[in-house]
Each structure stands twice: as structure tokens, then as C-alpha cells.
Amino acid sequence: YGATVDLVDTTKVGRNERVAQLAEEMPDAYFASAYDDRFVIEGNATIGDELAGRNFDAIITPVGGGGLISGIVTGLCRNGSRTEVYGAEPLLGNDAARSLKAGRIIVNETEPMTIADGARTISLGKLNWEIIKDSVADILEVSDEKIAEAVRMYFGLANLKSEPTGAL
């Protein structure tokens, strides 16, 4: 298919900086953020579509840049669901929780070094924030110790092999 894989050592260069470099090298390419992209949000909204018919009291979902949670909320809302949605993010990278409390996007100074590597984002995406700020009940902050405990618990009780971000 002609794809090129570009492995980025994030200890030497940030993801966003490398993407900016690649965008200059390939001006005709489409950059799809892993979270702050309308197509990504809409894809994740299909999860909310499916959950809407289940009549849950609440849903808790991991938060990094906000693509998953904003998509789920979008799907739930367009189906008329009143299910409350909560986010869970690493305490070491709690920009989403701080943003929700402050009423504006808070940016981490550096990429958080948490075991939940799928949530190592500097901040929520702008598109995601517009959805999250009015639709998410709360964002829970989880220590790396509790995340590791959850990974072990999933395996011990249900033989589920979860990566740390999924265990949030």
C-alpha cells in the first residue's frame, strides 16, 4: 500500500514536532490526530451508538487526548441516552481533570511519564474539549500504582491481558 512507518523516540523529539516535520516534507498528506480529528471522534462515536441501547447508569472510559471519551459522548447524546460518562486518566498526566475543573484546556509542561502510555498526552484536543466540557460528569485521577493493580486484577480474576491505559 506504500505506507512508511516512522518510529519516533519521544525522549528525543516530541510526537507533534515530528508530525510537523513530516507535514512540511509531505504537504499533500492528510494528518489524522489520534484524538483531535473529526473522523476519529466520529469513529469512536459508534461505540456510544452501541452503548446507548444498553441503559447503563454510568460509563467510565480512559482519557488521553480525549478522542475516545468525546466520541462515546457524541454517540450517546445523538441517541438520546442519559448515561453519565466519566473519564479516568493517570494522576501523572491529569490535564483533563484539571481542565474540567478550570473550565479551560490545561496543558502539561511535558509528556507525562506514566505507565499508561496511551494517555501520555500534553493536553486534550481542541475538538475534544468542546464536547467534553459540557458532557462529561467528571474525570477521575488514577495513580500508577492503582493502574498496575488493575492490570494484575484483570489478569488474576478474568485472565484478561490489559495494557495499562485500558485498565484505567
What does each model-found stretch correspond to?
Residues 1-168:
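PLP-dependent amino-acid enzyme catalytic core
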